[in-house]
Amino acid sequence: MAALRAVCSLRGVGAQVLRAGSGIRLPSQPSRGARRWQPDIEWAEQFSGAVMYPSKETAHWKPPPWNDVDVLKEKVVTNVTLNFGPQHPAAHGVLRLVLELSGEMVRKCDPHIGLLHRGTEKLIEYKTYLQALPYFDRLDYVSMMCNEQAYSLAVEKLLNIQPPPRAQWIRVLFGEITRILNHIMAVTTHALDIGAMTPFFWMFEEREKMFEFYERVSGARMHAAYIRPGGVHQDLPLGLMDDIYEFSKNFSLRIDEVEEMLTNNRIWRNRTVDIGVVSAEDALNYGFSGVMLRGSGIQWDLRKTQPYDVYDQVEFDVPIGSRGDCYDRYLCRVEEMRQSLRIIEQCLNKMPPGEIKVDDAKVSPPKRAEMKTSMESLIHHFKLYTEGYQVPPGATYTAIEAPKGEFGVYLVSDGSSRPYRCKIKAPGFAHLAGLDKMSKGHMLADVVAIIGTQDIVFGEIDR
């Protein structure tokens, strides 16, 4: 066995001589043009830190930086992710927000929806046009009859029928009662979220009186199913118009009391002025409607621009804001309640006599007295409520000025007694999409005020 053997090194480092049995590598004379050897990273790291007397503590020591700039890990602040809702009392139902906070400031707001999804639009396709009506009460369950009104107008447009004048006046009357119901809920719960409890208790007593009007006319306090295609279900009972007049006469005093407590209140103004500001351009780009649009200074009200039923025969003003903040939207809602009282008084004074259902046997069921004497009327009633009436093929988009904004129904008929497709346009969906824009840069407590001013109900958003 030879004492020495030559081993050619790889990558031009040079030949190395390996002594037999020793394991010691001796670098040979580098050849001409060979590259200089560079230590690898692992070789260099073994000399970093404390090398003199290594121990468990000193092994992790590092030399100080040469430029005297050392970033400590304790000073690196990361944003906090906070889950707001769906159990939070200020979430107005089942709203879940994923908030990214920098300290107390909101950097990002991500709404998560769908926790109240019930598949309403699909369920409607399996019901007749009359059986689908109660689903609309349960969409925006704070303004029930306004939803019914939009659906009934859409079906009437496809059927090419028009309800009698008395039915139209009754619709407008209860549509404005519903608007007051909604705005009471919006304003007082907004105040309750911020910390003012008294208006909530004051105004809910008035709200109970309006629920009584609902009950006297339909039998139900909330989900009335009263406004139907072709008119309304029943005529107004005796004495109801007198009681509505007494209510409207005294209700303006309740509004004055709430305004006296809130409008010039220092705490209320600090919590709402310049909070959640939306410019007119942003409001249009996000698809806002209703008070959210009018609060930014755009005078757009479907009762004025595209009148339905008898809104072209009543006089009222459309309040608009100037700054587009929470305070302006509060003032708009309060003034809209006063304008609704004006419309209610005009409806009571101009209420005509006559029928409350369209004179069309294919749509309107026979009267109870006829059913007790005529077998044909009984059969007609049975067929109408089991099979329904056939609607000519076509499609329509019908929108009304609901209390929260533009509530639209896109209805497609294929000629059968069931809708082929019913698409519901909820105003709160677009408002919730703008929550990130409205709350960015505000404090965490201001997010509650912004949710309250949007007047969100998840029955119509999740559907």
Curated annotation (Swiss-Prot):
Core subunit of the mitochondrial membrane respiratory chain NADH dehydrogenase (Complex I) which catalyzes electron transfer from NADH through the respiratory chain, using ubiquinone as an electron acceptor. Essential for the catalytic activity of complex I. Essential for the assembly of complex I. Redox-sensitive, critical component of the oxygen-sensing pathway in the pulmonary vasculature which plays a key role in acute pulmonary oxygen-sensing and hypoxic pulmonary vasoconstriction. Plays an important role in carotid body sensing of hypoxia. One of its GO terms (biological process) is mitochondrial ATP synthesis coupled electron transport. InterPro entries: NADH_Q_OxRdtase_suD, NADH_UbQ_OxRdtase_49kDa_CS, NDH1_su_D/H, NiFe-Hase_large. It is found in: Mitochondrion inner membrane. Its main location: mitochondrion. Signal peptide: none annotated. It catalyses: a ubiquinone + NADH + 5 H(+)(in) = a ubiquinol + NAD(+) + 4 H(+)(out). It comes from Rattus norvegicus (Rat). Keywords: 4Fe-4S, Acetylation, Electron transport, Iron, Iron-sulfur, Membrane, Metal-binding, Methylation, Mitochondrion, Mitochondrion inner membrane, NAD, Oxidoreductase, Respiratory chain, Transit peptide, Translocase, Transport, Ubiquinone. Its cofactor is [4Fe-4S] cluster. This is NADH dehydrogenase [ubiquinone] iron-sulfur protein 2, mitochondrial. Its EC number is 7.1.1.2. The modification Symmetric dimethylarginine is found at residue 118.
